[in-house]
């Protein structure tokens, strides 16, 4: 006679980012305050017996599992962990303002486009004169993060080898694309190569700006 397996879709919790000294008992001790626990296990390496940095906890009911996943910054054994329902996988770590180091935000006067300029033309202050406009690739003018390479590097300090081995957790850092300032280079003109038209740049003098447009 076969035993019917209990559905643990909404009660089984994935716990990532665990310290390597975390054990089954210490993991259980953290989650028992949220309700009854059916199982708490830390995944270990078969050869070395050392923790892989993540584990699973199965709560007795759905309400207890929801309470356990509410804390956005759970601290287990002195380290910030990643707690979420197992079928959803690891929670993605959102980019905070701490990753904007070295990124200069745009002045609102340049975002409003009063002179018909496209969002791809911005003024990098302290780099060139205000009267010169250079083409700069910007993914989203509403986003304060222009240099995604810096954000990717800052994010990498939170990733561990344990997440690479966990099937639910994809590497979020791979989704960032680096953007930077690029200059247009015109190829040399030869007898066999026709002359390419010069790149058009939009330019206007700063004295044409009205004071009310810079507010």
From Swiss-Prot:
This is RNA-binding protein 38. PROSITE patterns: RRM (PS50102). GO terms for molecular function: mRNA 3'-UTR binding. RNA-binding protein that specifically bind the 3'-UTR of some transcripts, leading to maintain their stability. Also acts as a mRNA splicing factor. May play a role in myogenic differentiation. Pfam families: RRM_1. InterPro entries: Nucleotide-bd_a/b_plait_sf, RBD_domain_sf, RNA-binding_reg, RRM_dom. It is found in: Cytoplasm, Cytosol; Nucleus. Belongs to the RBM38 family. One of its GO terms (biological process) is regulation of RNA splicing. Residues 11-88 form the RRM domain. It comes from the Eukaryota. Keywords: Cytoplasm, Differentiation, mRNA processing, mRNA splicing, Nucleus, RNA-binding. SUPFAM superfamilies: RNA-binding domain, RBD (SSF54928). One of its GO terms (cellular component) is cytosol. The gene is RBM38. Its main location: cytoplasm.
């Amino acid at each position: 006679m076969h035993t019917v397996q209990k559905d643990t879709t909404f009660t089984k919790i994935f716990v990532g980012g665990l310290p390597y000294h975390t054990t089954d008992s210490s993991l259980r001790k953290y989650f028992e305050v949220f309700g009854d626990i059916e199982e708490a296990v830390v995944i270990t390496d078969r050869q070395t017996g050392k923790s892989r940095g993540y584990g699973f906890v199965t709560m007795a009911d759905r309400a207890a599992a929801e309470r356990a996943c509410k804390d956005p910054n759970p601290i287990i054994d002195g380290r910030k962990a990643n707690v979420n329902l197992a079928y959803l996988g690891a929670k993605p770590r959102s980019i905070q303002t701490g990753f904007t180091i070295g990124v200069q935000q745009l002045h609102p006067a340049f975002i409003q486009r009063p002179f018909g300029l496209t969002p791809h033309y911005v003024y990098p202050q302290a780099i060139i004169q205000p009267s010169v406009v250079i083409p700069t690739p910007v993914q989203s003018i509403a986003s304060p993060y222009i240099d995604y390479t810096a954000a990717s590097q800052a994010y990498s300090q939170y990733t561990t080898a344990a997440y690479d081995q966990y099937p639910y957790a994809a590497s979020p850092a791979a989704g960032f694309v680096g953007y930077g300032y690029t200059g247009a280079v015109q190829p040399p003109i030869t007898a066999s190569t026709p002359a390419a038209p010069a790149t058009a740049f939009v330019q206007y003098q700063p004295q044409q700006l009205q004071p009310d447009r810079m507010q």
